[in-house]
Regions:
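C-terminal regulatory/oligomerization modules of transcriptional regulators
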Residues: 1, 51, 55, 125, ...
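N-terminal leader segment of winged-helix/HTH proteins
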Residues: 1-38
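Membrane-interacting alpha-helical segments
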Residues: 2-7, 89-94, 147-150
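Alpha-helical linker/hinge and terminal dimerization helices associated
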Residues: 16, 20, 104-119, 134-145
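N-terminal helix-turn-helix DNA-binding core of bacterial DNA-binding proteins
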Residues: 23-70, 75
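Generic structural concept
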Residues: 44-45, 94, 128, 135
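Charged, amphipathic alpha-helical coiled-coil/dimerization segments
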Residues: 73-129
Length: 150
């Protein structure tokens, strides 16, 4: 650990993201799941009710900046694994899907508590505000690049 703060930029933010993601992916691998499956399952589990498949796919593609075809394939895999269920175009998590989401959440919650231990709440709050602003600006830039490419 260092007390000298590195300059904040894409590399520093990316290193933190990929370190955290690697932890999550290790936990997920123990349960035979992937990162994209977990994000898709999270969207279904935390929804107020069943989601239209298109809305679920849109939510996940928006979060991950991934292709819709990839997310449709992920939904298909979760359906085949019995972690999601379909009623027509409506998708909902199964009990097994909720259980996997809860188990992974509990495991990663313990790890996250260790990762964030000892960091003053005001520093975490400031970091959250900065990252929210960076995300907002990056999403605006991505939208502009997408418009320009059309």
């Amino acid at each position: 650990m260092t007390d000298t703060a590195p300059p904040v930029g894409g590399r520093t933010i990316g290193l933190a993201h990929y370190a955290g993601r690697a932890v999550l992916e290790r936990v997920l691998a123990r349960h035979g799941a992937t990162f994209q499956q977990q994000i898709t399952l999270r969207a279904a589990v935390t929804a107020d009710g069943p989601l239209e498949r298109g809305a679920l796919v849109e939510q996940v593609t928006g979060a991950l900046k991934s292709e819709a075809a990839d997310v449709h394939a992920t939904v298909d895999g979760l359906l085949a694994a019995g972690l999601l269920a379909a009623d027509g175009s409506l998708i909902r998590p199964t009990d097994a899907g909720r259980e996997l989401f809860a188990v992974v959440g509990a495991e990663t919650g313990e790890i996250s508590a260790r990762i964030y231990a000892g960091i003053p709440p005001e520093e975490l709050a400031a970091t959250g505000r900065v990252l929210a602003r960076v995300t907002e600006r990056a999403e605006a830039e991505l939208a502009e690049l997408t418009r320009a490419a059309r």
